[in-house]
Amino acid sequence: MKKILLPIVAAFTLYSCSNSDDLIDEQELNLTEGYFITNEGQFNSNNATVSHINGNLSALTNNIFKSANGKVLGDVAQSMAVTDKYVFVVVNNSNTIEVVNKKTFKSVYTITEQLNFPRFAVVKNGKLYVSLMNNAEVLVYNAETFAFVKSVALNYPAEQLVANNEYVYAANNFYSGGTLVELIDVNEDTNTEDVTLNAAINGLTVSGETVYVMTNNDTNSFIYALNGTTVSATTDLELANGRNLSVDGQSLYFTAETDVYKINPSLASTANKLFSVGSGNGYALTYGFNVFNGYIFTGNAGNFTDNGKVVIYKEDGSLVKEYTVGIAPNGFYKY
């Protein structure tokens, strides 16, 4: 009798264990500070995730959306926008924007209306602005009710979005060689002005009322300072493949291949090379990049199939922390 029962019990045990792996227990998160990381995942694989590093950089929590909600985030976490109350996670290939409580990361709402491969988002004046990969428009939603408000027509599809008190700046699609920054009046939500630059736009950031735009071609990279529609300053970096333009305090940062650079926002001085993140594919090694409080965050996507690394440096290139996160870490956002 025992010889008959034991295989049955063993089989039941194995079946139970394998099923329990598919069950996801929701956890109560209590996030009050730190940094969010969007892990893109693999295209068509539904394995995008979000990670969180605490404020003193001592602890990492992976897959916080799944932990908080008992379900996966979706397919390709492209970017996010963070407000005092909510985090808007743009999930490109799922055609969703997951709205979550900033503290608990519990899902509040899933925006789907009008979305067609959403890319980047910014919140201004109580409105959420969203760019689309293939459509020459920016979508506008109410940032509290999440209702669709309107579509703002552009000349070309846009990528990154930033905002100051006057405009939302929409940079033309980087991958199609766009050279146009289109300005949306934040009061009227109309495309009122355009600024044409000299090369393909490959970076966009804002500090106060000044918007900084990086462009590049095969041989040179440039940074422009825009105040409204006026180009107030520009510099030729004399470097190829400038990317990842970021601002922290009184400095601008960017990457070129595997090197990290710093430059004064006046753009009156030359860029200072800080350090190299290593040898190899600079695009993968700095797939994600941002700077907070003097700490330089890099997202190493590796082979874009296995889990990636977040490597945090000081300006002198000394290592602060290294963490294993999700697949293809592509962005860092302050709590």
Each model region followed by its residue ranges:
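Short loop/turn segments that connect beta-strands within beta-propeller blades
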Residues: G55-N56, N101-F105, N142-F146, D185-D189, ...
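Structural motif
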Residues: N44-S51, T96-V99, E137-L139, S176-L183, ...
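Repeated scaffold domains used in trafficking and secretory/extracellular systems
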Residues: G74-S79, N116-V123, Y156-N165, A199-G208, ...
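Bacterial Sec-dependent N-terminal signal peptides
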Residues: M1-Y35
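Solenoidal tandem-repeat scaffolds enriched in leucines and small polar residues
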Residues: F148-T235
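Surface loop/turn motifs at the tips and blade-to-blade linkers of beta-strand repeat domains
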Residues: I64-L73, T110-L115, S151-N155, D194-A199, ...
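Conserved beta-strand positions in repeat-built beta-propeller and related beta-rich domains
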Residues: Y35-S45, V89-N93, V130-N134, A170-S176, ...
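Intrinsically disordered, low-complexity segments enriched in Gly and acidic/Ser/Thr residues
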Residues: A233-T305
